[in-house]
Amino acid sequence: MPNIMLTYRCNLHCSYCFANEFVNKEKTDISLENFQKAIEFMTRSGETHVGLIGGEPTLHPNFQNFMESLISNQKVSGITVYTNGLLLDRYVPQIVHPKVRVLVNCNSPQIIGEKAYSTIRNNLDVLIRDYYMKDRINLGINLFSNELDYSYIMELLQRYGLYRVRISVTVPDFSVCGDVDILQYFKDRKAFLLQFFKDMDGIQVLPYYDCNKPPYCVWTDEERNWLESYVAKYPVSESNLVGNHSRCFPVIDILPNLQAVRCFGMSDFEKVSIQDYENVPDIASYFINQIDSNAYKLSACEKCRSCYERMIRHCTAGCIGFKAAQIHTCNAYIESI
C-alpha cells in the first residue's frame, strides 16, 4: 500500500523516531496540487488503498478536505491514517466513514505527558465506544528500549477489547551509529521481546511485526516452539511472529515534493521523482532492483553466507537499513564497470 506524506511537522518529538530525516526539520506541507497529482499517480493501475502519513498527518491544514476527496474517489478502495491520535477529535465525521481505518501509534505517558496521553485515550473512547470503530482501529507500539514500560498499551488493549497490536522493533540511527552487528542486535532484544509476548499472551493479545522482524535463527529451538504454540492459540490464518521470513517489500512513500522513497527506513538512501515513472509498481520494481536485490546477496555474518532462507530471498536479516552502506558500495561498483 503506497503512502502520501502530508507534512513534515509533528506535534510530538519522540527521540526514537525513524523519520528524523524529515520530521520537524522543516515545516513542509504537501500542496493541494501535489496531493491531487499523487492520488492520480497512485490510482493509475486501478483501485488502491491509500495511507496518509507524516510527521503527523492530521496537522495538515487541508486534512479534512483531503479525507473527503479520498472518500469520494471511486479509485480509492480504502484509507489508512497513521497518527499519534492527538487530533482525531477534530475529524470525527471523516474518520468514522466505512472506508477509513486508523493506526494509532501509542506512546507512553512517561514520554508524551499525562495530558497528551489522556487526550489520545479520550479520542479512542469516542471512536471505539461511540462510533463502534473497534474493528477499524489498530494500536501500535514502538519497542525502542529493553527498559520500556509497556503497561500502558496493555491497559489500552484491555480497555477496548482488542486482540492484536502492531509492534515495531526500532532500528538504530544508521547515520551516526556506524556498523552494527545485526544478529547481535536482535539477540540483545530477545529477552525483552519474549517477556513482551508472554505479557501479551496473558491478556489474550497477539502482536504482529510492522517491519524489522528478527531473523528466525536468533531464537533457540525452545523459544521457537514457545512462539509457535503461542500463535497457534489464536484464530488467525497466519502470523508473522513465526516462520523463516524476515523480509519486507517496498512500501513507496510519496513526499510533499512528489519524490518517492522505498520506505522511511531507507529514506536517505535514494529518492526518485514520481514524474519519471508510469505507476507505483514501476517505482517498487526500481527499488527492488536497486536495493532489495543486493540486500539478499549481502550476508549479515559468516553464518548467513550459507543460509538457505537468504539464498531464496526469504531473509534479509531484519531492516534493510542495516545494510544501506554496503548496498551503496555495491551499486557504485556496478555503475563503475
Residue ranges of each PLM-predicted region?
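Activation segment
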Residues: C14, P61, G113, R262-F264, ...
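Canonical Radical SAM [4Fe-4S] cluster-binding loop centered on the CxxxCxxC motif
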Residues: M1-E33
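Flexible mid-to-C-terminal extensions adjoining Fe-S/redox cofactors in radical SAM and related proteins
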Residues: Q259-I337
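Radical SAM/AdoMet-radical enzyme domain recognition
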Residues: K27, L32-I53, H60-F186
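Short, solvent-exposed loop/turn segments at secondary-structure junctions
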Residues: N11, P57, L86-L87, P109, ...
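A structural signal for short, well-ordered beta-strand segments
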Residues: P2, L6, L139, P250-I252, ...
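A C-terminal junction/extension of Radical SAM enzymes
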Residues: F174-F269, R310
